[in-house]
Amino acid sequence: MMENYEEIRLGHIRSKDLGNQVPDTTQFYPPTKFDFGAEILASTSTEAEAEAEATATTTEPATSELAGKANGEIKTKTLAAREEQEIGANLEHKTKNPTKSMGEDEDDEEEEEEDDEEEEEDDEEGITGTSNEDEDSSSNCSSSVEPDWKLRWLQREFYTGRVPRQVIASIMPHFATGLAGDTDDSVLWDYLAHLLNEPKRRNKLASVNTFDDVISLVKKSQKIIVLTGAGVSVSCGIPDFRSTNGIYARLAHDFPDLPDPQAMFDINYFKRDPRPFYKFAREIYPGEFQPSPCHRFIKMLETKGKLLRNYTQNIDTLERVAGIQRVIECHGSFSTASCTKCRFKCNADALRADIFAQRIPVCPQCQPNKEQSVDASVAVTEEELRQLVENGIMKPDIVFFGEGLPDEYHTVMATDKDVCDLLIVIGSSLKVRPVAHIPSSIPATVPQILINREQLHHLKFDVELLGDSDVIINQICHRLSDNDDCWRQLCCDESVLTESKELMPPEHSNHHLHHHLLHHRHCSSESERQSQLDTDTQSIKSNSSADYILGSAGTCSDSGFESSTFSCGKRSTAAEAAAIERIKTDILVELNETTALSCDRLGLEGPQTTVESYRHLSIDSSKDSGIEQCDNEATPSYVRPSNLVQETKTVAPSLTPIPQQRGKRQTAAERLQPGTFYSHTNNYSYVFPGAQVFWDNDYSDDDDEEEERSHNRHSDLFGNVGHNYKDDDEDACDLNAVPLSPLLPPSLEAHIVTDIVNGSNEPLPNSSPGQKRTACIIEQQPTPAIETEIPPLKKRRPSEENKQQTQIERSEESPPPGQLAAV
């Protein structure tokens, strides 16, 4: 949501219509967590307080009195360190003109509007400079007025019986179209509350721009907040989760029934089956790794009294190993563990033996008679697992999905955000809330520095230092060591990089390779085309069309594939290519089965080779979420008959298309001149070794346009030059006779079709999947019987005795070329 930022449209709502006026901007209001449907409580005490407040302000209008009572009926759960407070009850009205008559409603309304205008003018004149400051610091949701009146407006909508989908459609029409139909209303109300409380994006400071400014800020700042993510621990050797051989991929192999690899960290799944977590917990267990230069840099800030707090999203406890005391582990850590039943706590050493033995540790207080923990690799029934968790097991105090952050985070952050004078973000994508809100929670006047491999487009930093975090920290320490040898001791590399305004020109060898492959494909297309006509062209067309569909899909989240070999700007890695081929194979299986069925109806039976195989339903899902390559064939060692589906796959002809190959696009870091770092023309972005940014446009733009024109005019979906699509598509199979793939859910399928329809400037004639989908809906209507209106299929080579009859039928069915030209 943070990347696809959509401005909320509430222009038709006036804050004074909500019954409470804009309060004094100097008053502090803590943020409220609005849990609709979960924390709606009736309270007589709050009603009495609301009535007492209404009595005290006798000049308050009747509408405000009713709103106050409504507001008093709701209690909301706030931060853990604060008491519950009423929404809308924390704002008081300023007294109105005492000469107003309560009996004259129309006059009251007119006078109220006039008074409101006067008050607004007085506020603007009386508070000098605060209006601009509040506008800049409106991202601070706790001190801004706007989120408060938005929540009061949302509360009014809730009590008037509005449907949450209608509310979402009124403020965010684009987002409302993508809501799932089965989403509960309480979830939507909760989402709306968080959405309206979302802080505004901060504007960049004009006074902080250069790398020298960063060094100056570090030298003079005394209360620095450092927010760290996984990027600071990459060089420590901690295994990753999402690579080909990462934890998630191996987890799916060992636990094929796991609905999603991330369920390993889902609290609800953990309560049902804790085995996946304890099977791989030893790989991320602390004590086996050493701190990185980033950790030592943060420790030096603390030693010199400059560190206000280190907020870390990591659970590796390397901050503790580095000796950092002023640290908040936002997502918990392995340092302690708690019982899931009685909340008994113990330290990490008590679980160490069980963790490394891959056993599920039981609570010594809840199950004192159990001599040994349960082996996580031993197969047990669901009932045994449920009973095991209910009896009490030990869970490390890391924050799982579905759990709240530690109370310490909310308590400390409430004070730190108002006193910090510099924010440094190192190695984090800032996509997980509420930690992602830290940059927007501190005052907008506080400088913010980003040290990361990639840019964060959903946030605005004053200076972006892009590259390997260890390399960047090393250069910062060199700059700081001019007058202090303590910083020089942290330098792990003696080389000092110099600033450069120029990048090396991109290598053109990749261009020549790309054009050579296009020329080779053009020259060899005629001979290959003849061989294609002598084979089962139905499978060829299915293969090419599926390739086109996957190629147009681009990047799809949670789809099992991330890029394609057809139209992606980058060349796919081996893992991505394997994942794509796996999905394409399943698509071809479905299409070939339909083809075989159609051939049986037409009496066109032919010898075909079949292969029986087994596939895991749990692996073949659209929710891989990071699994890029996994074996789809079940081995006898872990085959479970209840989880298998027997399939008959039709083997397509062994015709291997020539994939479109592109040279690897160079990153800006790969074009750095030796011994330099690059200063971008925007004057606040810098590229160091290891950066994953692409700022060169002369590589891909011209080639992409030339390649697109070449494909649209001369080549088919395989890249073979020949007749246009119109000729080839006359006998093609309608891909929409079946779903695109059993792996693709309807939403993703619609997304792919949309990308295909809108992906090119010149839509291909008679080959648009959108047109085929429309035609399929019409064709799928009930018909009396299959007669002559059968979707055209490209048949096998007809025998000599049927050629003449076929030519006669075609001449009768198709109009002369003159008529086609006239049309």
UniProtKB/Swiss-Prot annotation:
Gene Ontology cellular component list: cytoplasm; nuclear inner membrane; nucleoplasm; nucleus; rDNA heterochromatin
Cofactor note: Binds 1 zinc ion per subunit.
Residue positions of the active site: 331
List of residues that carry Phosphoserine: 618, 621
Top-level taxon of the source organism: Eukaryota
Annotated Acidic residues bias: 104-137, 698-707
Cofactors, names only: Zn(2+)
GO terms (BP aspect): behavioral response to ethanol; cellular response to insulin stimulus; determination of adult lifespan; heterochromatin formation; lateral inhibition; negative regulation of DNA-templated transcription; positive regulation of feeding behavior; positive regulation of Notch signaling pathway
Domain called Deacetylase sirtuin-type: residue spans: 204-499
Pfam families in the cross-refs: SIR2
Quaternary structure annotation from Swiss-Prot or TrEMBL: Interacts with the transcriptional repressors hairy (hry) and deadpan (dpn); via basic domains. Associates with the Esc/E(z) histone methyltransferase complex. Interacts directly with E(z) and HDAC1/Rpd3.
Function according to Swiss-Prot or TrEMBL: NAD-dependent histone deacetylase involved in heterochromatic silencing. Mildly suppresses the heterochromatin-mediated silencing phenomenon known as position-effect variegation (PEV). Required for epigenetic silencing of the polycomb group proteins. Has histone H4 deacetylase activity in vitro. Required maternally for establishing proper segmentation of the embryo. Involved in sex determination. May be involved in the regulation of life span.
Protein name per the record: NAD-dependent histone deacetylase sirtuin-1
Species per Swiss-Prot/TrEMBL record: Drosophila melanogaster (Fruit fly)
Gene name, Swiss-Prot/TrEMBL: Sirt1
